[in-house]
Structure formats: C-alpha cells, structure tokens
UniProtKB/Swiss-Prot annotation:
The gene is rplB. Disulfide bonds: none annotated. HAMAP family: Ribosomal_uL2_B. The lineage of its organism: Bacteria, Bacillati, Bacillota, Clostridia, Natranaerobiales. Keywords: Ribonucleoprotein, Ribosomal protein, RNA-binding, rRNA-binding. This is Large ribosomal subunit protein uL2. SMART domains: Ribosomal_L2 (SM01383), Ribosomal_L2_C (SM01382).
Length: 276
C-alpha cells in the first residue's frame, strides 16, 4: 500500500494524505453480511454523554466480521479485498466451498484467489487460523483470542501483530503490540500474519472536516473552561492548572498516578508489563 499526496490547491489539501487503496478490488459490500448501525453520538440509554468528543459522523453500515474463525476443514477462496469504514484494517470476503460467505480481517500480502483455511491442520500461511498450540514459536499472528472460542480480541488494527515467543505447560507467552508479554491458553486461536494496511499510521487528515466525517468532535482543554466545569478551569487570564498534578474532569489524578487496579485478576497472566 502507498500513500497518496495532493497539490496544495487549498489549505486543507496542503498536508492531506490518503491511502491509495491499490489493494481494494471491490467497491460495494456483500449485502448478506451487512447490519444496521445507529450513531449514538457518545450517548447512553438515558441520552447523557458517556463518551465525550463523539458525534456527527457519516452514515455507515456494520460489516459482520468472523472473529472466531471456527469453520474448520472447509477451504475458502478470497473473493475480494474491501474497505471497511468501521475499522482501520481492510477486510477480505471469503467464499467457502459449501457456499457460505464470511468477512475476515485482510492480512498483509493476501490477494483475491488465495486459499484460506481454519483448524488445527491448516498450513502456517497468512490468513489461516489455528489454535496457538499448532503455531510454531516465533510466528507473527493477529486476531488473537484471550479465551477459547470467544473470538479474536488482540491485534486487530491496521498494521498490528503479536508474536508467539514461548510455550510452557497449558499456556503460550505472546508478545503484544504494546510490548507486553502475556500468557494465553494454547487452545485459543490466532490468525497467521500481520494485519494489512500498514501505512495507515502515516495518513494525515489534513483538515478538521475529515475528522468530523469520522465522528470526532473538538477536544476542549480543561484550563480553557470555567471552574464549575473542570478542576483545571477558572482563574484570571491564561491561568495555570493550579494544582500539583493534572486531574480528569471528574477529579481523578491523571498524571504520575497508576489508574490500573493493583489486584486485578488478569495480573497473573502478565509475564512482562508494557512499561517495563
């Protein structure tokens, strides 16, 4: 994938870059794999803001992705590579020999016509999904499960991957994109290869309007607010925070303070923390 630049015919296009989308082979999605998606604008069921800075995005439909990859022993053929507005990665449409169609995350290097399989007997090839016990140590994987049969949860964004670094007993040591090393059960599944669209991190939106199309609203600094709205607010002129450290709008420390619970159940599965 390459990045496309524009001539500076306007201030918004001066630094704007987009993905060339050379890999995409189909414009219209598969209708049987679409679902309605309502824009909640960051509101909960009471209509109150639960997630700030969201709203006003372009209408879109959800693409139903096969996270579990549980169709064992049935080969499939990659029909097309498609754009998905709901995620940074591209998606691949699979046509199984029994007639079923499913979407998966498009791994790096996959193309229409490639053969894809799932199950313990599948080959170690990009796009194939296997239990971790059947994947050699050192292999790069993505869409990794945390619990068997729950569906992939780790390394699903564009360009991300995990690496199996060791196997011990019932667990494998997996290095995550955050550099954290975590123990994951050998029966959990993972897909071989790296997620495609690796140049996504280098894309420059170029103007505020493109962010608004994505549903991102402006972020207002706490020091620019009134004292009633934020712990950093108030004061005469451009006043400083006025406290020893920074705080969230709800009064919790947000700098120099560990916000993870000290006795979390998943701590026993973490071999190396991401900040060590």
């Amino acid at each position: 994938m390459s990045i496309k630049k524009f001539k500076p015919t306007s201030p918004g296009k001066r630094y704007m870059t987009v993905a060339s989308k050379e890999e995409i082979t189909r414009e219209e999605p598969e209708k049987s794999l679409l679902a309605p998606l309502k824009n909640k604008s960051g509101r909960n069921n009471q209509g109150r803001i639960s997630t700030r800075r969201q709203g006003g995005r372009h209408k879109r439909k959800y693409r139903i992705i096969d996270w579990k990859r549980d169709k064992d022993g049935v080969p499939a053929k990659v029909a097309s590579i498609e754009y998905d507005p709901n995620r940074t990665a591209y998606i691949a449409l699979l046509n199984y020999v029994d007639g079923e169609k499913r979407y998966i995350l498009a791994p790096l290097g996959i193309k229409p016509g490639d053969k894809i399989e799932s199950g313990s007997k599948a080959e170690i090839r990009p796009g194939n999904a296997l239990p971790i016990r059947n994947i050699p140590v050192g292999t790069i994987v993505h869409n990794v499960e945390l619990k068997p049969e729950k569906g992939g949860q780790l390394a699903r964004s564009a360009g991300t991957y995990c690496q199996i670094v060791a196997k011990e007993g019932k667990y494998a040591h997996v290095k995550l994109p955050s550099e954290e090393v975590r123990m994951i059960h050998l029966d959990c599944r993972a897909t071989v290869g790296q997620v495609g669209n690796v140049e996504h991190e280098n894309i420059d939106l170029g103007k505020a309007g493109r962010a608004r199309w994505q549903g991102k609203r402006p972020s207002v600094r706490g020091v620019a607010m009134n004292a009633v709205d934020h712990p950093h607010g108030g004061g005469e002129g451009k006043a400083f925070v006025g406290r020893k450290t920074q705080y969230t709008p709800w009064g919790q420390k947000s700098a120099g303070y560990k916000t993870r619970r000290k006795a979390k159940k998943s701590d026993k599965y973490i071999v190396k923390k991401r900040n060590q």
